[in-house]
């Protein structure tokens, strides 16, 4: 008897691997900025999440994920490791998708997402120096004046 691999099972494995990769990237970013995720401000958390959404785009392109898979991966990333509620994650993911496809909707967030695409490449190439510089420049630019 021949065992067949269920396409749904393969899909689950691909998404689980992508989710793990995103978590590792967020962990690495937090190490590089010297602040655990749970100690970041809400603004920093949102910036890192938008940056991570750029990584979702990179993974989607690399792994040829369909739109529903990319959406699910985005929501998964916002729930874990960012600890947004399911509804917050859905709403935030929808906002990120809108902003990513319309620069004029929120130019700063659009730029952060696109820098996250570069950040994903830096993470995969183990370019910690480039990744640290990338995220630190963004965080410095969005910090409110004191």
Indicate residue ranges for each PLM-predicted region.
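N-terminal low-complexity, intrinsically disordered segments
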Residues: 1-84
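Low-complexity intrinsically disordered segments
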Residues: 89-146
């Amino acid at each position: 008897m021949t065992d067949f691999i269920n396409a749904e099972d393969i899909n689950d494995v691909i998404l689980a691997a992508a989710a793990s990769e995103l978590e590792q990237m967020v962990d690495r970013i937090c190490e590089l900025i010297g602040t655990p995720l749970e100690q970041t401000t809400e603004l920093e958390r949102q910036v890192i999440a938008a940056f991570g959404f750029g990584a979702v785009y990179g993974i989607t392109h690399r792994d040829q994920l369909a739109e529903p898979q990319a959406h699910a991966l985005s929501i998964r990333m916002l729930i874990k490791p960012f600890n947004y509620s399911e509804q917050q994650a859905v709403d935030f993911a929808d906002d990120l998708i809108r902003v990513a496809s319309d620069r004029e909707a929120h130019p700063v967030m659009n730029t952060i997402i696109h820098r996250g695409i570069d950040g994903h490449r830096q993470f995969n190439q183990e370019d910690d120096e480039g990744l640290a510089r990338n995220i630190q420049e963004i965080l410095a630019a969005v910090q409110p004046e004191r």
